[in-house]
């Protein structure tokens, strides 16, 4: 254990995903060695994130405005909605350059063992969005692009059950080809692009 603020910094860094005790200690001592202006810039960025970053009121993606740039872009097809778990998954799909619709970010996946049920996800917002015709456009297709793991598949199955009886709505799931147990964000652009292009009807 180190003294005072050094240990406090290590403890806080260790709370970040993917950062273990050794990594937290290494980052902390790196920060202690850099010039004060570098620390000031990092502090300023963290303050801007705290004060200026919000979630899009339509899709739930991260944004610095009430609507993210994708939901604000009239060139995007509002009738086509790709459902993903996290904002990082939006970036993964965008890198494929294969999708010109809009997104809906659930904020996670169903995981009863961790206490994450339907009420903890943005499923009701998705249903409201389909029913309310955002920007005057009917949603014609929902593409379910949750991760190809147990939680993602459970979430996809639940969504199909909630969406399949909505008149005029097609529900599809991205095709196989992504490794089971993987995360969407780590899929290469070509594989993910093919999975989108080869999506299959679910309802």
UniProtKB/Swiss-Prot annotation:
Belongs to the RecR family. Residues 79-179 form the Toprim domain. Keywords: DNA damage, DNA recombination, DNA repair, Metal-binding, Zinc, Zinc-finger. GO terms for biological process: DNA recombination; DNA repair. This is Recombination protein RecR. InterPro entries: DNA_Rcmb_RecR, Hlx-hairpin-Hlx_DNA-bd_motif, Rcmb_RecR, Rcmb_RecR_Znf, TOPRIM_dom, TOPRIM_RecR. The keyword Cell cycle does not apply. A zinc finger (C4-type) spans 56-71. GO terms for molecular function: DNA binding; zinc ion binding. May play a role in DNA repair. It seems to be involved in an RecBC-independent recombinational process of DNA repair. It may act with RecF and RecO. It holds the Pfam family RecR_C. SMART domains: HhH1, TOPRIM. CDD domains: TOPRIM_recR. Disulfide bonds: none annotated. It comes from the Bacteria.
């Amino acid at each position: 254990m180190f003294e005072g603020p050094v240990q406090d910094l290590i403890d806080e860094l260790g709370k970040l995903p993917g950062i273990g005790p050794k990594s937290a200690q290494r980052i902390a001592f790196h920060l202690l060695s850099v010039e004060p202006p570098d620390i000031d810039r990092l502090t300023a960025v963290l303050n801007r994130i705290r004060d200026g970053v919000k979630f899009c009121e339509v899709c739930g993606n991260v944004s610095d405005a009430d609507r993210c740039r994708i939901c604000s872009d009239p060139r995007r097809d509002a009738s086509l909605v790709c459902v993903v778990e996290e904002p990082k998954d939006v970036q993964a799909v965008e890198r494929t350059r294969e999708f010109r619709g809009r997104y809906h970010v659930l904020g996670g996946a169903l995981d009863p063992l961790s206490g994450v049920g339907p009420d903890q996800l943005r499923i009701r917002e998705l249903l409201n969005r389909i029913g309310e015709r955002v920007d005057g456009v009917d949603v014609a297709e929902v593409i379910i692009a949750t991760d190809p793991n147990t939680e993602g598949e459970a979430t996809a199955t639940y969504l199909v059950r909630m969406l399949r009886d909505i008149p005029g709505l097609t529900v599809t799931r991205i095709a196989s080809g992504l490794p089971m147990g993987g995360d969407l964000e780590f899929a290469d652009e070509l594989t993910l692009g093919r999975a989108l292009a080869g999506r299959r009807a679910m309802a």
